[in-house]
Curated annotation (Swiss-Prot):
Residues 25-78, 172-175 form a propeptide. InterPro entries: Glucagon_GIP_secretin_VIP, VIP/GHRH-like. One of its GO terms (biological process) is regulation of G protein-coupled receptor signaling pathway. The modification Lysine amide is found at residue 168. PANTHER family: GLUCAGON-FAMILY NEUROPEPTIDE, PITUITARY ADENYLATE CYCLASE-ACTIVATING POLYPEPTIDE. PACAP is a neuropeptide involved in diverse array of physiological processes through activating the PACAP subfamily of class B1 G protein-coupled receptors: VIP receptor 1 (VIPR1), VIP receptor 2 (VIPR2), and PACAP type I receptor (ADCYAP1R1). Exerts neuroprotective and general cytoprotective effects due to anti-apoptotic, anti-inflammatory, and antioxidant actions. Promotes neuron projection development through the RAPGEF2/Rap1/B-Raf/ERK pathway. In chromaffin cells, induces long-lasting increase of intracellular calcium concentrations and neuroendocrine secretion. The keyword Protein biosynthesis does not apply. Residues 1-24 form the signal peptide. This is Pituitary adenylate cyclase-activating polypeptide. It comes from Mus musculus. Keywords: Amidation, Cleavage on pair of basic residues, Hormone, Neurogenesis, Secreted, Signal.
Amino acid sequence: MTMCSGARLALLVYGIIMHSSVSCSPAAGLSFPGIRPEDEAYDQDGNPLQDFYDWDPPGVGSPASALRDAYALYYPADRRDVAHEILNEAYRKVLDQLSARKYLQSVVARGAGENLGGSAVDDPAPLTKRHSDGIFTDSYSRYRKQMAVKKYLAAVLGKRYKQRVKNKGRRIAYL
């Protein structure tokens, strides 16, 4: 067996003391079984001291109740209601925008809404020209329908489209 140096021995004793003080502390919920004094302790003025062994610190209950108490303390009910109202309003706006975008994507994916009635019968005939001079083709009419749907959805979505059209000529690079 090798001899331990003084530093190792001191570290070992320190570790044992720290382990016993942490595992037997009142905060851990354990009591000192054999060290409890039977007599009351008094301070300098003769007043009885508080019994720390029978005292339950606040928050010893469930962690969830401690979180609720802290939440109620830092966030009063009136401020919480205002915050929830603002959050719900912003959430509704985001959901409206997402649903409008999803609708736009579905319309564009279907071919600009040519089959909006929901009929399952697709016309297998190839695209034909609408006028004899060939200026207006089906692809151009499809493009016009797409632009009409985009403008309508932009009007529904609001201000964002106006800013995009306003800044169309100049592109701003964001860092």
